[in-house]
Amino acid sequence: MEIPEEVKKRLTIPFEENFFAGHTACQGCGASLGLRYVLKAYGRKTIVVIPACCSTIIAGPWPYSALNANLFHTAFATTGAVISGIEAGLKALGYKVKGEDGIMVVGWAGDGGTADIGLQALSGFIERGHDAVYIMYDNEAYMNTGIQRSSSTPYGAWTTNTPGGKRHLLEKRHKKKVIDIVIAHRIPYAATASVAYPEDFIRKLKKAQKIPGPSFIQLFAPCPTGWRAPTDKSIEIARLAVQTAYFPLFEYENGKYKINMPNPKKEPKPIEEFLKLQGRFKYMTKEDVEALQKWVLEEWERLKKLAEVFG
């Protein structure tokens, strides 16, 4: 009997589990799901570097760990520097780094520790050309320290320091395009991914493993706690982020762009479908929604042009 295509696609997700149950993540945590997929893709022969963030708590305090892999806790700003040093040290000792039979060095940092505090170290890691993978799990705020805004927080969002209410003190800046900054370094491989599309994420992790030099993946990872969303809606929200083109899926490989949307010819859904499931957007006015929708569609058209010209 021939295996259906949908089943074949599911079989691309490895069965091996290297992220143990009983960790301290909140229910519906997108970051913990993403980390589980990383360890499925790369296995135990992996060194995971985690700065100060939610994942530090989720992984567990020394000497305990929810990861069946090597774990290195580091300071907030230093993920890019530490994975650079580990990679260089392994090579100095004669170990093979990256590739299917090499040791995988992975930086796993949130948007605050990447887009803000860790941007300089990330830039240096890419510029020096280290054989490692940097993954920014993007939950769009400093969730571990109390839901403060980051430069990856979207326009119109409530956080504890953009509180909305009668004075309407919402986030009024659009989300920083971190992946564009990374691509400006002419990195060999960069991609966006989402926990709602695990097969696509696994494929990109495997590609990052094979391509020499630095790789970067920006992973959309909902936080029900910070987004004021039901814990059973994380995957639906992540899927709508893609379907509305708020967070489009694409790859940049050696100067070429490729869009990976599930239905690339389908028009994006209205941004309201993404917003309405999250309490963090409840203070937005009609004008706010229109401003965000305009930005999303402009960015989507820009990405399509890049893929057309540099595809």
Curated annotation (Swiss-Prot):
Protein name: Ketoisovalerate oxidoreductase subunit VorB
Enzyme kind, highest EC tier: oxidoreductase
Gene Ontology molecular functions: 3-methyl-2-oxobutanoate dehydrogenase (ferredoxin) activity; thiamine pyrophosphate binding
EC number per UniProt: 1.2.7.7
Keyword annotations of the record: Oxidoreductase
Subunit record text: Heterotetramer of one alpha, one beta, one delta and one gamma chain.
Family matches, as Gene3D superfamilies: 3.40.50.970
Entry annotated with the keyword Oxidoreductase: yes
Chain's gene name: vorB
Swiss-Prot/TrEMBL catalytic activity: 3-methyl-2-oxobutanoate + 2 oxidized [2Fe-2S]-[ferredoxin] + CoA = 2-methylpropanoyl-CoA + 2 reduced [2Fe-2S]-[ferredoxin] + CO2 + H(+)
InterPro entries hit by this protein: PorB-like, THDP-binding, TPP_enzyme_TPP-bd
GO biological process: organic acid metabolic process; sulfur compound biosynthetic process
